[in-house]
A protein has these predicted regions:
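C-terminal helix-to-coil terminal segments
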Residues: 88-99, 116-117, 170, 255-311
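Glycine-rich NAD(P)-binding loop of Rossmann-like domains
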Residues: 117-149
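Rossmann-like adenosine-cofactor binding region
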Residues: 168-262
Length: 311
């Protein structure tokens, strides 16, 4: 049987993915046809991004699974017409490695105090050595694929890393805490906080005034996860008071970030335009193709979304 695989995404574009998907699917040995315009009645799989025009999945009677090209699924997971398995993108070659590089780079930037040397209009000679990594406690909120990879990379550099997640995890070399009762403990005394949680009702404003108050004075906050994780007003107040020394933010409630947003003008905020990590077409295509192969072989799909949890 020839499978029909619909490409339904505005970003990334079909032009970017046509060749990598064709190559990856060809390597599986499956018979297939692939494209952005296929009859709904014949579609077996959808390679998807939530910005697609496809929002009514009930139009696809043969649909077996939806393979998301984005790591985040908050814009599709609650779709009542989606009644087949939904797999999120976990791309160790591209997405994960990119996040590790972004997080590690900004952790080292703040740990080493590089901003004082990069921006030094007074030409001051700041002869003050930074502490060693072993003396800089780091907390990572979120121990999914991205959070775990970042936590392991920082631990390998000598940072004492605490990881927190909704459910219990055991990861060699890390102090792992979980559940609402242990969130405060995970935050207590952290000098660098990294947010890599999904966007769910339970994580909205998880970094509020009470949470910020538990960090070490002069802490650094890095958010490459999701914009709604942060209570923006509380973070700005913490920056103004010095409770937080600096925040590096890659994601926001509204994107692009409005030009009049207070973050732009704040000297304690670094803004990057949602570039912490990108799905790479070549490696992502291999992830998608492997999941289709697994489905056709009767094997469980990888990276299935838990609808109840929202990620």
């Amino acid at each position: 049987m020839t499978l029909s695989i619909l490409y339904a995404a505005s970003s990334p574009s079909w032009e970017e993915y046509e060749a990598p998907l064709t190559a990856a699917l060809g390597a599986t040995g499956l018979r297939y046809r692939l494209g952005p315009d296929l009859p709904a009645a014949e579609v077996d799989y959808i390679v998807y991004a939530p910005d697609s025009d496809v929002q009514d999945f009930s139009r696809f009677p043969r649909l077996k699974a939806v393979l998301n090209l984005w790591a985040g699924v908050e814009r599709v997971v609650g779709n009542p017409t989606l009644r087949v398995p939904l797999a999120r993108m976990v791309d160790d070659e591209g997405l994960t490695q990119g996040m590790v590089e972004y997080v590690t780079g900004h952790v080292l930037r703040h740990h080493l105090g590089m901003d004082a040397h990069i921006v030094n209009p007074d030409h001051a000679w700041h002869h003050e050595a930074p502490p060693l990594s072993r003396d800089r406690p780091v907390t990572v909120l979120g121990l999914g694929a991205l959070g775990t990879a970042c936590a392991r990379a920082l631990s390998a550099l000598g940072f004492p890393v605490t990881g927190w997640s909704r459910t219990a995890k055991q990861i060699d070399g890390l102090r792992c805490l979980h559940g609402t009762d242990q969130l405060g403990t995970a935050l207590d005394g952290a000098q660098i906080l990294i947010l890599l949680l999904p966007d769910t009702a339970a994580t909205t404003d998880i970094l509020d005034a009470a949470a910020l108050a538990r960090l070490a004075p002069g802490a650094f906050v890095i958010n490459p996860g999701r914009g709604p994780l942060i209570d923006d007003g509380a973070l700005l107040a913490a920056l103004d008071s010095g409770r937080v020394a600096h925040a590096t933010l890659d994601v926001f409630r509204t994107e692009p970030l409005p030009r009049d947003h207070a973050y732009w003008a704040h000297p304690g905020v670094t803004i990057t335009p949602h570039i912490a990590s990108e799905t790479r077409a070549g490696s992502a295509a291999r992830v998608v193709a492997d999941n289709i192969r697994r489905s056709e072989a009767g094997e469980p799909l990888r990276h299935l979304v838990d609808r109840a949890a929202g990620y």
